[in-house]
């Protein structure tokens, strides 16, 4: 890849010969969706083959490109993403796009897969699965634009950094290839602003140093110059006497055996624009001027603690989420004259100022300041002319008032039930669900379950959320549901307990199931422990997560769990052995009198109906 990036014809024959010697590049290469199919390998291998074809038009690699593209497209999960491996139909009741092995989605492995699919499309590959995968990826990665860098998997945007182990650079390239100008511009700037964190990264910084410079280069020559001005030392200090490069990392599992020379060469060749990952045919309309590039690069060392209140106030309109957030927290932590101006921003500010103002009066805002904005925020919360995303942000902020905001609990329930065609990933509903749980942990005790039809309709909708964090908010809302009301939510709780829905777009987190089992245990309903144990029968899901889930469940049942201990003892708890053994011992010694008669699910479901 590095040799291709030079654009020098003398290197093309070397690359051509090398590719023909690679088993994984042969026309008859065998790929699989099974456990042996590696998303890491398939994604990067396909990028090389595609870039090689687009540079040389050598038809030899087209059969392999077609196989990689279709296999990857078929191997994506319901979110359109990948983990260490593919979503194997054999582990998902024969269905495509089911659940991934282990702890599921990782953006660090998914982004190269997605980039390779976009390149394969440029190579002429056509397949319905490929088209669907590209559209899903565009929606998912586009959802982070303007909000933060990429997280580990299907999580919230990371607003505390400009970059996360090269993922801002990868996202810039992916969205450039997907013709998302706004997204490419945003993430190329995020990459340019992260020059001070080039030696950071989960299990090592290899991907950071590979991709970040490539992403920054999409912002044009001035951005490339500014980036290399700040990072040239890295290349120099890693250079060896023989012209190669070292990979220096003290991290465990830090990509041993990787060729770091190729990473440095690809970055050195950014100005040549010979590869698509190096900015070939990049959109020049997003190129930064020299002054703008210097300003963005300077954000890497911005210390908001040294800024005046006036300077911090101006940053509430900054395009970078990290800068705005730091300005909010720093300004709020000092005595200043701008509180009333920030209240006015809620209604009269720019889009970014309004977002900053909502955050200012949210989490950990001093009550004396937050109280000044309640009336304005409540009016916006109820205003149907406001964007739904803004109303959800306001719900999140106002929820931090706790009991002081209970009057708005029904308004948020109604927002959950409103149709939101723009909320393709359910992010707005998830935020509203979190607001409800933050505002009141037990709405029954607080007297907030007045309109049962409204309350349970919102809870049921959230429990059907495709993301685990969304489902968890729905179950938490009803964690104290009385038996006479169980029929309102019984089917939703059972669906979460059974956990068989392969259309979930996040499923690694067992929090919804733990909450559901808690309801079963509190209402003395049979099947809770069996539901928890069923997770161990699935090939997907991380074993450690399953063990921790079961350790949360068993103590809730206490003496009622004695009958299941023989099965529990068959499980190897690994590093959790100490806690595991104590839980088992506590159950074995529990007073038998404490055991209660269990209700069958249908009995519990019908209890309230028959009263």
What are the roles of these predicted feature ranges?
Residues 1-4, 38-51, 105-118, 163-176, ...:
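Well-ordered alpha-helical segments within folded domains of soluble proteins
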Residues 79, 90-209, 219, 226, ...:
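Extended ligand-binding clefts on enzyme/binding-domain cores
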Residues 180-189, 215-218, 222-318, 581-611:
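Terminal, non-catalytic domain-edge segments
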Residues 38, 106, 319-320, 349-350, ...:
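Short inter-helical turns and helix N-cap capping residues of alpha-solenoid HEAT/ARM repeat scaffolds
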Residues 12, 278-279, 305-315, 335-347, ...:
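Amphipathic alpha-helical scaffolding segments comprising HEAT/armadillo-like alpha-solenoid repeats
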Residues 1-2, 174, 217-218, 295-304, ...:
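Structural detector for internal amphipathic alpha-helices that build alpha-solenoid repeat scaffolds
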């Amino acid at each position: 890849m590095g040799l291709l990036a030079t654009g020098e014809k003398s290197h093309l024959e070397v690359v051509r010969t090398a590719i023909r010697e690679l088993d994984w590049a042969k026309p008859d290469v065998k790929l699989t969706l099974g456990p042996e199919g590696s998303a890491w390998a398939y994604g990067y291998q396909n990028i090389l083959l595609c870039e090689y074809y687009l540079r040389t038009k050598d038809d030899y690699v087209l059969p392999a490109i077609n196989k990689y593209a279709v296999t990857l497209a078929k191997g994506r999960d319901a979110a359109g993403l990948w983990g260490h491996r593919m979503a194997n139909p054999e582990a998902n009741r024969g269905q495509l796009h089911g659940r991934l092995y282990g702890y599921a989605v990782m953006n660090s492995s998914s982004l190269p897969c997605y980039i390779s699919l976009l390149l394969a499309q440029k190579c002429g590959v056509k397949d319905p699965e490929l088209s669907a995968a590209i559209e899903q990826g565009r929606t998912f990665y586009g959802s982070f634009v303007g909000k933060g860098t990429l997280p580990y998997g299907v999580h919230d945007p990371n607003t505390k950094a400009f970059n996360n182990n090269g993922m801002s650079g990868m996202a810039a390239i992916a969205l450039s290839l997907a013709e998302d100008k706004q997204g490419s511009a945003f993430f190329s700037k995020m990459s340019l602003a992260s020059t001070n964190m080039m030696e950071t990264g989960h299990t090592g910084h290899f991907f950071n140093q590979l991709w970040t410079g490539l992403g920054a280069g999409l912002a044009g020559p001035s951005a490339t110059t500014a980036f290399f001005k700040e990072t040239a030392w890295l290349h120099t200090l890693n250079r060896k006497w023989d012209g190669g490069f070292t990979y220096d990392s003290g991290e465990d599992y830090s990509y041993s055996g990787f060729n770091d020379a190729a990473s440095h060469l690809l970055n050195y060749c950014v100005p040549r624009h010979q590869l698509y990952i190096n900015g070939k045919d990049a959109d020049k309309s997003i190129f930064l001027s020299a002054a703008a590039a210097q300003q963005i690069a300077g954000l890497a060392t911005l210390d908001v603690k040294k800024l005046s209140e006036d300077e911090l106030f101006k940053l509430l309109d900054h395009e970078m989420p990290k800068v705005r957030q730091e300005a909010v927290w720093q300004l709020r932590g000092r005595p200043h004259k701008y509180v009333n101006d920030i209240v006015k921003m809620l209604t009269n500010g720019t889009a970014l100022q309004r977002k900053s103002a909502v955050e200012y009066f949210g989490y950990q805002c001093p009550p004396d300041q937050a109280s000044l904005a309640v009336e304005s925020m409540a009016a916006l919360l109820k205003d149907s002319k406001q964007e739904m995303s803004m109303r959800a942000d306001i719900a999140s902020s106002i929820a931090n008032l706790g009991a002081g905001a209970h009057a708005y609990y029904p308004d948020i329930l109604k927002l959950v039930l409103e149709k939101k065609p723009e909320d393709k990933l359910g992010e707005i509903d998830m935020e509203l669900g979190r607001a409800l749980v933050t505002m009141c942990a037990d709405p029954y005790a607080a007297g907030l379950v007045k309109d049962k039809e409204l309350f349970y309709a919102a809870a049921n909708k959230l429990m059907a959320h495709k993301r685990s964090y969304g489902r968890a908010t729905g179950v938490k809302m009803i964690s104290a549901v009385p038996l006479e009301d169980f029929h309102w939510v019984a089917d939703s709780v059972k669906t979460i307990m059974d956990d068989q829905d392969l259309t979930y777009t996040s499923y690694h987190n067992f929090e919804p199931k733990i909450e559901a089992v808690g309801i079963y245990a509190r209402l003395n309903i049979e099947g809770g422990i069996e539901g928890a144990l069923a997770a161990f029968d699935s090939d997907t899901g991380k074993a450690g997560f399953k063990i921790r889930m079961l350790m949360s469940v068993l103590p809730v049942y206490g003496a009622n769990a004695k009958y299941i201990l023989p099965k529990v003892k068959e499980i190897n708890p690994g590093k959790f052995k100490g806690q595991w053994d104590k839980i088992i011992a506590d159950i074995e010694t529990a007073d038998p009198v404490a055991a209660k008669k269990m209700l069958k699910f249908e009995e519990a479901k019908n209890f309230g109906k028959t009263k």
